[in-house]
Amino acid sequence: PTSHGVPSCGWLVQQHAMPGKFDRVRADELELNAKERALLARGEDVIGEDGSALEARWFRGGERAAVSVLFSGDTAAQPPEWKPSVSPTLLIHEATFLSEQQEKADEHMHSTATGAVASALSVNASVLALTHYSNRIKSSNQSEQEATAVDTDLPVLALNDNDRLVVDDDGTVTHLRWEKEGWTPTSIEPNR
């Protein structure tokens, strides 16, 4: 839930933790047949043709962490109802105003860029993406500068129309910004 004067909502999209990748090279080295590979890939231990035991865990890399994106709609900073079941990899949060318009933000139940940082810290987000700016803000860089001025190691980026975000399985966020020459990618490592 969000905290706003009119109906508004947010969404949490989550990919749960996944098993590590299957080690095909090791399976090739041991000359495993298709049935043995399939059983091991499903997590089942196998007794080889020679009677040796093969444990499925020997053929998997480390578990890939859960990845999640929390999208806020219009909201005041730090809605008391926010209690996500996981710390989001990426929080996409409105930053309608700058801190100099805090009273207006409070009056209309919107956030400032620093309020968005407070929201991100309250849910332990790894990366914060700002969006939804008032027309009083001439450049999204103003919001980004205000947010990054807060003394924290939280990576912050400011979104503009037509930007794209890609969240990889390892939690790396790639910000794609369209420029005259094409898409310009910027990778942001999570703060975890």
Language-model region placement:
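Active-site-proximal loop/helix segment associated with metal-binding centers of metalloenzymes
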Residues: 1-71, 75-84, 90-92
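Binuclear metal-ion centers of metallo-dependent hydrolases, dominated by the metallo-beta-lactamase
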Residues: 77-192
